[in-house]
């Protein structure tokens, strides 16, 4: 604004009349003659030429305005107390930048998958048959805790090294078994998953690969530790659970590796890694199957594209087909899909089995039919021949009964031929 405009606006302010407005139309008390008791005049100072879009500054004393009837307005209902919000959205495991609708479950989505509707922690505690305090004792991740909920021990691997197992203690194991029956066993699983699924076994996982020219076997590295707390929580939210309930359930089914630390004479167990599905918890196998649903669908689509068949038993991925020229393409794309889904292929355990050699899937020979391999059948016949000469006849007989039952499950005709070589009892 130039000096001329400024001077002109000041001169107009000196000679202009104040703008007044009567407020008699307001809800004010009237006297006996029907006239308002108080009349408030608002003075508007026009500070310059008004243009469209300009604002006027109105100066008035609010104490002179008539007071209307006060109506009671109830306060907004709190979703949760401050302490509860800090516990659920602490920075250790849960982000605080959440939308309000994330607190609520999608009941239509839960009904679509046949899952129980749990809106709050109270619903989860009631379903598990414990108090809210007991549930929170197991469902809060602590940076240090004096009592461990898992017992950790090492089991040697056949390939060398050790495998760490984390067995939950009695009360936590009981809670996880109830969760397995109420929730985890109902989670959606792909048709290609054959491990830890009721009605499926190593036989159903190996049968689709019988008589194929080439069999490709891949192995997922660190299968259980790759399924983290965030994956489990995200799966439950996608299935329809609210954020607090999903976070509570995810903590119940995961655990982090902990290191004992002594501080001022008190022994604490401090986490040294993220919370993951542990091998030893009743919920881990079925939960990992549900987390791998999208990977199974992508790998099954890849197999169909090249005329292959795909199945998975736990962390063992198997492809089979008759087009040998597409083998390398399938292997490369499968490894890429696995990496995109947050897993890793164990290169040392990748195997390609052709028709001229032994083809085994989940420990079952699939060259021409399901059953024992050429090397295993003579070994079992020798064990049947030596049955009567064993020092502990009953123990040896029970072991052979189990082997024959296993063969009968895979191939009844092969088991019947082997059983004919067995001597009757008492001879």
UniProtKB/Swiss-Prot annotation:
Residues 136-366 form the Reverse transcriptase domain. GO terms for biological process: defense response to virus. The keyword Metal-binding applies. It is an enzyme of class 2 (transferase). Its EC number is 2.7.7.49. One of its GO terms (molecular function) is metal ion binding. Pfam families: RVT_1. It catalyses: DNA(n) + a 2'-deoxyribonucleoside 5'-triphosphate = DNA(n+1) + diphosphate. It comes from the Bacteria. Mg(2+) binds at residues 219, 315-316. Signal peptide: none annotated. Keywords: Antiviral defense, Magnesium, Metal-binding, Nucleotidyltransferase, RNA-directed DNA polymerase, Transferase, Transposable element. InterPro entries: DNA/RNA_pol_sf, GrpII_Intron_Splice-Mob/Def, Reverse_transcriptase_msDNA, RT_dom. M.xanthus contains two independent and unlinked retrons: Mx65 and Mx162. Retrons may be the ancestors of retrovirus. Belongs to the bacterial reverse transcriptase family. PANTHER family: NUCLEAR INTRON MATURASE 1, MITOCHONDRIAL-RELATED (PTHR34047), RNA-DIRECTED DNA POLYMERASE (PTHR34047:SF7). Reverse transcriptase (RT) responsible for synthesis of msDNA-Mx65 (a branched molecule with RNA linked by a 2',5'-phosphodiester bond to ssDNA). The retron transcript serves as primer (from a conserved internal G residue) and template for the reaction, and codes for the RT. The retron is involved in antiviral defense. This is Retron Mx65 reverse transcriptase.
